[in-house]
Amino acid sequence: MSHAQEHEQPAGPALPQTRTARHRRIVDILNRQAVRSQSQLAKLLADDGLTVTQATLSRDLDELNAVKIRNTDGDLIYAVPSEGGFRTPRAPLGESAKEERMRRLSAELLISAEASANLVVLRTPPGAAQFLASAIDQAELHDILGTIAGDDTLMLISREPTGGQALADHLLRLAQNGG
C-alpha cells in the first residue's frame, strides 16, 4: 500500500461520500451519543473520514429534521425524532419509564388537543411533533391505534370509534399534571 493510500480512508469499513451515506452516519452518531454542537458533530464525522463544511452540515441537519432537545442532564443535544430520537445513555425503559417519558414530553411540548370521533389532533411547538409522536408510539398505549406527525401537528387514531375525546382528555391531563 502506498503512503497516499494509507491516508485516503480511515480505519474500518470504507464509507461512501454520498449525501445518503452522510445522513445515515449523522443519524447513527446522534443515536449513539449526546452531540451538543455542529462543530462537535463535524469533528465526529471527520474522525470517520467524512469531511463536511458547516453549511453542508447545517443543511443535512435541516433535511433530517434534527431538533435540539434537553437531555436528562439538562444539556441541549441534537436528536432526529423520525429515527427514534433521544437515544442517550439511561436505564432501559420499562413500561412505566416509557409512560413517564411520554408524560414528561407531553408536559413540555403539548399545546392543545382536540378530538373528533376516533381522531385526536395535537399541537406542539414547531419541530416537536415527531418527537412527541415517537414518545407516544414507544409508550405502546392500547387505546392508540397509531400516530401521524408533521412539523407541529400530530394526529392520533383511537382504537375505539368514539374514543377520541377520552384520549384527548387523557393527554391533556398528562400535560397538566405530568412534567
Curated annotation (Swiss-Prot):
One of its GO terms (biological process) is protein complex oligomerization. GO terms for cellular component: cytoplasm; transcription regulator complex. Gene3D superfamilies: 3.30.1360.40, Winged helix-like DNA-binding domain superfamily/Winged helix DNA-binding domain. The keyword Zinc does not apply. SUPFAM superfamilies: C-terminal domain of arginine repressor, Winged helix' DNA-binding domain. Pathway: Amino-acid biosynthesis; L-arginine biosynthesis [regulation]. Its main location: cytoplasm. Keywords: Amino-acid biosynthesis, Arginine biosynthesis, Cytoplasm, DNA-binding, Repressor, Transcription, Transcription regulation. Pfam families: Arg_repressor (PF01316), Arg_repressor_C (PF02863). Residues 1-20 are annotated as: Disordered. Disruption phenotype: Deletion alters the expression of 1544 genes. Belongs to the ArgR family. NCBIfam families: argR_whole, PRK03341.1. Transcriptional regulator that regulates arginine biosynthesis, by repression. Additionally represses many other genes including those involved in pyrimidine biosynthesis; nitrogen metabolism and nitrate utilization; antibiotic production; osmotic stress protector ectoine; genes related to hydrophobic cover formation and sporulation; glycan cell wall biosynthesis; gas vesicle formation and genes involved in secretion as well as genes for membrane proteins. Has a weak activating function on some genes. This is Arginine repressor. It comes from Streptomyces coelicolor (strain ATCC BAA-471 / A3(2) / M145).
